[in-house]
């Protein structure tokens, strides 16, 4: 999904509407949070239509229709497989206790976690999610970025933060949100080479250790 997203954003920035929509469609077929790529395309399409007062070419309109088709097809396919074309996907999510409640469940989980002993994986999930929110705030408040990039990142952050029932998996939901690294990358360009190397090495080491722990020692699903 991340590759589809990166190239879709590039296609949007270069006004290759059908290529961007096709990649968004494929992203929606790979993972449910691929809807973020479709959201980026729809944001760009909406902006283009607003600027031209609806007089954009047929490719812009086609992109708006094609972009969410992959995600909608995925949802319908899950529904058909579960016996309820329209509600089956959401029933499956409910069965996994996965739901979107604007972060209420996550806040309750954090409150309970801070009130007593907790597993290392949960603590890391909280740390990574908090860092993601902070980086998103820096992204929004920093230099002006293209609307598709902001829309894509915002949807991924909202899904990760606002969802409940999968707290330990929140870092995985943020994996495709690579624009969150732009503020850090900008800061590293202004740092001394030794400091930049030290920061990158430390982050890479932390990522490697946490990944090894999550795959081998953690007693929880990621």
Kindly label every feature range from the protein language model.
Residues 1-7, 27-39, 170-176:
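Multi-pass, polyprenyl lipid-linked donor-dependent membrane glycosyltransferases
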Residues 6-19, 188:
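Membrane-interface transmembrane helices that cradle and orient dolichyl/undecaprenyl
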Residues 12, 26-33, 81, 161-163:
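Transmembrane helix irregularities
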Residues 64-68, 190-220:
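Signature aromatic-anchored transmembrane alpha helix within multi-pass, membrane-resident enzymes
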Residues 112-115, 119-146, 156-160, 178-184, ...:
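Hydrophobic, aromatic-rich transmembrane alpha-helices
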Residues 151-169, 205-220:
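Transmembrane-helix signature of polytopic, lipid-linked glycan biosynthesis machinery
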Residues 168-188:
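Hydrophobic/aromatic-rich transmembrane helices and adjacent perimembrane loops
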């Amino acid at each position: 999904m991340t590759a589809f997203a990166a190239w879709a954003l590039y296609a949007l920035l270069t006004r290759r509407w059908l290529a961007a929509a096709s990649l968004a469609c494929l992203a929606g077929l790979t993972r449910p949070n691929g809807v973020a790529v479709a959201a980026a395309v729809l944001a760009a399409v909406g902006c283009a239509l607003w600027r031209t007062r609806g007089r954009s070419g047929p490719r812009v309109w086609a992109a708006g229709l094609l972009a969410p088709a992959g995600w909608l097809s995925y949802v319908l396919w899950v529904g058909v497989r579960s016996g309820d074309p329209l509600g089956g996907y959401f029933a499956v999510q409910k069965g996994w206790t996965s739901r979107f409640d604007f972060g209420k469940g996550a806040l309750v989980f954090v409150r309970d976690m801070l009130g007593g002993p907790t597993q290392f994986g949960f603590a890391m999930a909280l740390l990574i999610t908090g860092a993601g929110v902070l980086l998103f705030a820096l992204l929004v408040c920093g230099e002006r970025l293209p609307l598709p990039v902001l829309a894509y990142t915002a949807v991924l952050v909202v899904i990760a933060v606002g969802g409940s029932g999968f707290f330990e998996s929140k870092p995985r939901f943020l994996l495709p949100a690579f624009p969150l690294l732009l503020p850090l990358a900008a800061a590293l360009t202004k740092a001394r080479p030794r400091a930049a190397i030290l920061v990158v090495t430390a982050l890479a080491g932390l990522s490697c250790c946490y990944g090894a722990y999550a795959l081998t020692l953690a007693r929880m699903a990621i």
